[in-house]
A protein has these predicted regions:
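Non-catalytic terminal/accessory segments
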Residues: 1-461
């Protein structure tokens, strides 16, 4: 190793991991005082990937990503806020462990969250903050190398690709006459990935034995649940930055098989839809691909959730499609029900918190929901949902006001005539019925809710 290379390695081991934007501001003088880096030392081949993982720019990007993703602590209790200070003190040792192949990840912390469709729970494995940082640094390097080689039909967890693009591609297949879908559901995919099979796929792309050992260590790190650590014999736990990339690598073999057979398909992570022209063709594809997945990939197809059907009868990434000559994207019924259920949960809180707090929570949820489901082509549904949210709020505020005296006073204060306010306040009708009344439409108008920050799901409806 020459003198210049020695200087670069010394600089790498002394990286300044001070938190950006915190007590210390990085100004011109401070930047100039950082160790001179020179040009990045790029590995000549896949035998030296760990050197690229430990490059300064890659590490800074990894730190920024881990911080922006936030997330809870792992088994060691270290939080995101603690990470920069920890790295500042311990980075030289950590770097040496990574480059010598002796870094040992800690077990992941088991967390269970309800599935959106109410069908049980999804098990997550939360790595420690430090392990997330290392995984992120590894993932960035491998993603740059692997992603260009992945199938054009794969859309999940890939830079520059999205669920919206996947749904639009599915729509194009339907418009082109492929009116039947083979909807494949992989049973507990992330929990059942075969480690030996996966490591073989990685070894076909990576020669750096240190990296192979590190990835194997992450896979075998174990799971801590209720204070006890269980060994990990299969699966890539959801919750770590590396898991989505590894899942794409596993299923790239499925993509290539479908391409080899000439199928029209779309895959987003473990959601795969294959589009064919007839039900009979779909049944043949289902049988043969299930055999391939079971015997070649060592995975299991969930037969109860998989089906050959019309696209209008299935959902894909929260959307479905209309029948008829003009195929439109629509929001799947379960997604609509989940939206309403969440709105009910938020508006029930009006009784115990201020309307401002409720509005902030509603606005945050509705903007996020609109950002994704606004991709539908049925604006009338979005308009109806916005009106429904306002009705929920009117009913909730009516309950909050409780007594006829207060209800009358609140309505008058909001511009309702005394006579109409008195008649409405004395009504024996329930809150949901009165939410549609003229008095509440005037006193709690659309403009009033807009002034409180309530967004619309479509335009200014």
């Amino acid at each position: 190793m020459n003198l210049e290379s020695d200087k670069r390695q010394s600089a790498q081991s002394e990286l300044d991991f001070s938190p950006r934007g915190e007590a210390r501001k990085v100004g011109r003088q401070e930047v100039e005082s950082l160790p001179a880096m020179g040009e990045p030392e790029s590995p000549a081949n896949t035998c030296r990937i760990m050197e690229e993982v430990c490059e300064r720019d890659n590490l800074r990007e990894a730190l920024q990503r881990v911080k922006s993703n936030k997330g809870s602590a792992g088994v060691d209790g270290m939080t995101i806020d603690d990470l920069s200070a920890y790295l500042k003190e311990h980075w030289p040792v950590i770097r040496e462990q990574l480059l010598s192949g002796t870094y040992e990840p800690k077990p992941v912390r088991r967390v269970e969250i309800p599935k959106p469709d109410g069908g049980g729970v999804r098990k997550l494995g939360i790595p420690t903050v430090l392990d997330r940082f290392v995984q992120q640094a590894v993932m960035q390097v491998l993603q740059r190398q692997w992603d260009p080689t992945f199938s054009q039909h794969s859309y999940g967890f890939r830079p520059g690709r999205s669920a919206h693009q996947a749904v639009a591609q599915a729509q194009q297949y339907i418009v082109a006459g492929y009116g039947w879908v083979v909807d494949l559901d992989l049973e507990k995919f992330f929990d059942r990935v075969n480690h030996d099979k996966l490591m073989g796929q990685i070894a076909n792309r990576v020669e750096d034995k240190r990296l192979l050992k590190l990835i194997r260590a992450f896979l075998n790190a174990g799971v801590m649940e209720n204070g006890l650590v269980s060994p990990s014999v299969e699966g890539t736990p959801q919750g770590g930055p590396l898991s989505p990339l590894l899942s794409n690598l596993v299923l790239d073999e499925l993509d290539r098989e479908l391409e080899r057979r000439g199928h029209r398909f779309v895959r987003y992570a473990d959601d795969s839809n294959i589009y064919v022209r007839s039900e009979r063709a779909g049944q043949r594809v289902m049988e043969s691909i299930t055999h391939f997945i079971t015997h070649k990939l060592k995975l299991k197809v969930n037969e109860s959730k998989s089906a050959v059907a019309r696209p209008q009868e299935r959902k894909f990434l929260g959307f479905s499609f209309t029948a008829g000559p003009e195929v439109k994207r629509v929001i799947a019924p379960k997604a609509l029900e989940r939206f309403k259920q969440r709105i009910r949960e938020i508006t029930r809180k009006v009784k115990g918190v201020s309307i401002k707090t409720t509005m902030e929570e509603l606005a945050s949820y509705m903007r996020g929901w609109r950002g994704y489901f606004g991709f539908c082509e049925t604006p009338e549904v979005l308009i109806a949902l916005t009106r429904w949210v306002r009705l929920r709020l009117r009913a909730a505020l009516w309950r909050q006001w409780k007594t006829p005296r207060r209800r009358r006073a609140e309505l008058i204060a909001r511009g309702v005539t005394e006579r109409l306010a008195s008649n409405t306040a004395g009504s024996g009708r329930g809150p949901w019925h009165l939410a549609r009344s003229k008095a509440l439409s005037v006193g709690l108008s659309n403009a009033y809710f807009r002034s409180l920050g309530l967004p619309s799901l479509f335009g200014t409806c």
